[in-house]
Amino acid sequence: MPAEHIKPIINTENLDSPLIPTPANILISGNGDTRINIPFKAMDSSVISGIWESEAFSKLKSHPNEMEFCYLIKGDVKISDAQGNYSEFSEGEAFIVEPGFDGIWESKTFVRKYFVLAKCN
């Protein structure tokens, strides 16, 4: 029997969740369809964690009052701030998007990531 209050995040070959389209008002390029598996969500939605994936695409990304921890399971991303500065990450790397970020997320290839998103108000 598994330990109480312990929930594994299973990285299966194919996420068994429906495609979620990226809203047209933030989509920059690509089709923007994503899949997400959320095994944990706080009752007040202040913390969410799981697995997210997409094909190559780019979108506007804004984190005014939340942080996101990301660990790339597969793929390459480029994240650019509003001033045009950017950081690139590849499979096996982790990073944090801090509160106040405003810029562009680009999945340069197929991307799959573990993530934790937390409100910071």
Show where each model-derived region lies.
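Well-ordered beta-strand positions in beta-sheet-rich domains
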Residues: 51, 86-88, 102-104
